[in-house]
């Protein structure tokens, strides 16, 4: 994997609060190598380690995107949801930002069936067929469509398992992470000081609660994916 320069600036990360971890009582001892200090009852993340692993993650997604690989971004907590959708749309990735439905990847055949149903209902809505149904039947199908849009809207164009999954908040998305581990899908995960750095293929130590921190990390990854996609388009 070729190393590239991604303009990852320590001062920019400090301004975004990337270095603020959780309280010292809520920590995973495995995170000790990624912590530089304790301050006012919270752990301070070593930003040089953050920069190193973020750079590695950018290299990985660039190379994958330049080979036409598919990405899934997962972040369902309220603070991350809008950022995840925005980042995924910009980078033309799939995303889950409302709720992870158990078995979404490990029981892919069921997910695929739901996606087919979702696409069929969207087609019926666009062509006006729903309006021609009896009111009660139309109401039932509209509720189904709304439910599917909420939970599967970000993966509606996904035709198979993703090649790489990017996870925002390891604790919140533990089920998704476990499904990736089971299937052998490479993962990139934001990890705060209460997480296990050994679970993901690339763990980026960072504040996973602050919107500014999540935005900065996603911005770098999105830029790398977009650059990789441009390379793929130029050299198919």
UniProtKB/Swiss-Prot annotation:
<protein>
    <recommendedName>
        <fullName>Small ribosomal subunit protein uS2c</fullName>
    </recommendedName>
</protein>
<comment type="similarity">
    <text>Belongs to the universal ribosomal protein uS2 family.</text>
</comment>
<dbReference type="GO" id="GO:0005763">
    <property type="term" value="C:mitochondrial small ribosomal subunit"/>
</dbReference>
<keyword id="KW-0687">Ribonucleoprotein</keyword>
<dbReference type="InterPro" id="IPR005706">
    <property type="entry name" value="Ribosomal_uS2_bac/mit/plastid"/>
</dbReference>
<dbReference type="GO" id="GO:0009507">
    <property type="term" value="C:chloroplast"/>
</dbReference>
<dbReference type="Pfam" id="PF00318">
    <property type="entry name" value="Ribosomal_S2"/>
</dbReference>
<keyword id="KW-0150">Chloroplast</keyword>
<dbReference type="InterPro" id="IPR023591">
    <property type="entry name" value="Ribosomal_uS2_flav_dom_sf"/>
</dbReference>
<keyword id="KW-0689">Ribosomal protein</keyword>
<dbReference type="GO" id="GO:0003735">
    <property type="term" value="F:structural constituent of ribosome"/>
</dbReference>
<keyword id="KW-0934">Plastid</keyword>
<dbReference type="GO" id="GO:0006412">
    <property type="term" value="P:translation"/>
</dbReference>
<dbReference type="InterPro" id="IPR018130">
    <property type="entry name" value="Ribosomal_uS2_CS"/>
</dbReference>
<dbReference type="InterPro" id="IPR001865">
    <property type="entry name" value="Ribosomal_uS2"/>
</dbReference>
